[in-house]
A protein has these predicted regions:
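Short beta-strand scaffold segments in enzyme catalytic cores
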Residues: 38, 80-83, 196-200
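Active-site metal-binding loops of divalent metal-dependent hydrolases
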Residues: 12-14, 224
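Conserved beta-alpha-beta core of the PfkB/ribokinase-like small-molecule kinase fold
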Residues: 114-184, 196
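Short, conserved phosphate/pyrophosphate- and ester-handling motifs at nucleotide-, phospho-/glycolipid
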Residues: 40, 171, 222
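Alpha-helix C-terminal capping segments
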Residues: 37-46, 232-234
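Conserved phosphate-binding/catalytic region of the ribokinase-like
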Residues: 154, 180-279
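Conserved N-terminal subdomain of the carbohydrate kinase-like
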Residues: 7, 16-27, 42-120, 124-135, ...
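Short, Lys/Arg-enriched N-terminal segments with co-localized hydrophobic residues
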Residues: 1-5
Length: 279
């Protein structure tokens, strides 16, 4: 996979995460867009379209090292407080919210990932993205989260504006909040943390089993999975992309970085089970 050939865009707020574990508090860069960029930067030249007022200089430098950074002006920076109850369960609270993303760069891309954290991507931007790239992926989560500060709330929403996407990722628990049928998108990826997930290609169902990884935390897993799947799907068929994305995500969880070889990903992908379901 040649880095530098493809031009891709990731849209969404990067986030200042305040993480509480017991009495310890740490601050770090987060947000679905950040984790998707981390993965996608392994496949293509990435542009990041985001919005914030201020972030620590080293975080901005990290974003710039991953791709071309475009920051829309905002009075606020999106910030969450994550309180870990155990490695897979956390309580999430929205502290502040940056400005919405109301325009895309005026050019074409090979792929665009729309990964909002709390409703910062309007419906017309989704429609515009579909005209700007042949492969458009999105994560459902940020489209059904309330932008109101306080404990994170999911809102029921008619998500028919996502129709026509190449790839839509969602957590199995989130799907009931959105009216999305598997036939309305090319590929629908439903994950359930470390448990088996479901994927649909043109409405046909498959079951896939993520690789077991002992992890201290799972933050960013779904966003890395979406970023990696998008990267592979630019050049590989559906099932191969699914297996490789699952392997890529397992290695990310193990290392908490994407600094591993693609040979290792391809080797590990052979251990991922994907089976067609008859329903």
């Amino acid at each position: 996979l040649g880095r530098g050939k493809m031009k891709c865009l990731v849209v969404g707020h990067v986030v200042r995460d305040l993480i509480r574990r017991g009495s310890k508090i740490e601050e770090r860069l987060g947000g679905g867009a950040y984790y998707s960029v981390l993965a996608l930067s392994r496949f293509c030249d990435v542009e990041i379209l985001t919005s914030f007022s201020q972030l620590p200089e080293e975080w901005v430098e990290e974003l710039r090292s991953l791709g071309k950074l475009t920051v829309l002006p905002s009075d606020e920076t999106t910030s969450y407080e994550l309180t870990y109850l155990d490695s897979n369960r956390r309580e999430l609270k929205l502290i502040s919210h940056a400005s919405p993303i109301t325009e895309l760069p005026a050019r074409k891309y090979d792929a665009i990932i729309l990964n909002p954290v709390a409703n910062e991507i309007p419906e017309d931007i989704v429609r515009e993205a579909l005209n700007r790239a042949k492969l458009v992926s999105a994560d459902l989560q940020g489209f059904i989260r309330s932008p109101r500060p306080g404990p994170v709330e999911l809102i029921r929403r008619d998500c028919s504006f996502l129709k026509g996407l190449s790839v839509l990722h969602a957590d199995i628990a989130e799907l009931p909040y959105a009216k999305v049928s598997p036939n309305s998108v090319e590929s629908l990826l439903l994950t359930d943390g470390p448990n088996p997930g479901k994927a649909y290609l043109h409405g046909r169902p498959y079951r896939f089993v993520p690789l077991k990884v002992e992890v201290g935390e799972s933050t960013g897993a779904g966003d890395v999975f979406l970023g990696a799947f998008t990267g592979f799907y630019l050049e590989c068929p559906f099932i191969q992309s699914l297996k490789r994305a699952a392997a890529f995500t397992a290695l990310f969880l193990k290392h908490r970085s994407v600094e591993f070889g693609m040979d290792e990903v391809n080797e590990l992908a052979r251990k991922v089970t994907v089976e067609a379901l008859s329903e």
